[in-house]
Design a protein with these regions (language model features):
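Actinobacteria-biased recognition of intrinsically disordered, low-complexity terminal regions
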Residues: 1-7
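Catalytic-core "active-site belt" of small-molecule-metabolizing enzymes
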Residues: 8-203, 209, 217, 236-238, ...
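Short, structured beta-strand/loop micro-motifs enriched in basic residues and often containing a Trp
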Residues: 206-213, 224-227
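Short leucine-rich amphipathic alpha-helical surface patches
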Residues: 212-219, 232
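Conserved metal-binding segment of the jelly-roll/cupin
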Residues: 222-235
Length: 257
């Protein structure tokens, strides 16, 4: 089922945010926002993302971190994590709430100190980290077409739906995250092998620092206790099979589907 968007009236930020949340709740699809909003840019997309977060907070959710989608040589994209998205190792993924899910291995940084840009370096970012975990993130786009732009993804909170971190955290000292790899395995076999340096500008801490500087331009900081996910790229999630990501240094994490 698709949600039809008006092409004659410029939607307001709050109404677009409400439609995205409604589509998620009802498992409905909608055209990419850039189809109806020709002027959709990153500034407007982040306003929509923040308004959607405000509406989620009003219904009782709490911010617990951010997702970082790093892009080579350009400013990373960020999305919000709330407590409603966090899964425990004993939880089953609520696949009945998803339309076309994907899954990706992520490095999860748990912050020990507040990180506020501008001017944050990778070294400063890593020094602010308390523990590092293996993780999995589940994505699920609201869009019915494949023509979505980067601002479309931002408005939809980077398609982030759920995340899970492994049972064991590691102090960042002594870890060489620039060489970290992870493979995702499902019942049908291994899907992919991912190098985090391929998408995180040679070290995931570079993405963490860039995210802090990006958030500062919008008046935000990365707070103590937050989880920051730095990922690779999602692969299709075969519903009904457990998914395990095995990391080279951070051990493994399994998501029950």
């Amino acid at each position: 089922m698709n949600i039809e968007l008006s092409t004659t009236i410029q939607p307001t930020v709050d109404s677009i945010a409400g439609r995205l949340l409604s589509a998620q709740a009802k498992k409905q699809r909608m055209p990419s926002l850039s189809v109806e909003c020709r002027d959709l840019n990153f500034d407007l997309a982040y306003r929509i993302q923040d308004e959607a977060l405000s509406q989620r907070i009003e219904r009782g959710e709490h911010v617990v971190g951010i997702k970082v989608q790093s892009r080579s040589s350009v400013t990373p994209l960020t999305g919000w994590l709330t407590d409603a998205m966090a899964l425990r190792t004993s939880d089953h993924l609520p696949t009945e709430l998803l339309v076309d899910p994907g899954v990706e291995p992520v490095i999860a940084f748990v912050m020990g100190r507040r990180l506020c840009g501008p001017g944050v370096t990778a070294a400063a970012a890593l020094a602010a980290v308390d523990l590092v975990f293996a993780g999995l993130e589940v994505t699920d786009s609201r869009y019915s077409d494949r023509r979505c732009t980067a601002p479309d993804l931002v408005a939809d909170n980077l398609s982030s739906s759920y995340y899970l971190t492994g049972p064991v955290g590691f102090a960042p000292a002594g870890l060489d995250l620039s060489r970290e790899e992870a493979d995702i395995t499902v019942a049908a076999g291994t899907a992919t092998v991912s190098r985090f340096d391929a998408v995180a500008r040679s070290h995931p801490a570079e993405a963490l620092a860039a995210a802090a500087n990006c958030l500062a331009r919008r008046g935000h900081a990365i707070e103590v206790g937050w989880t920051v996910l730095v990922g690779t790229a999602p692969v299709p999630l075969p519903v009904g099979f457990p998914v395990t990501a095995r990391f080279s240094s951070l051990r493994s994490v399994t998501l029950a589907c």
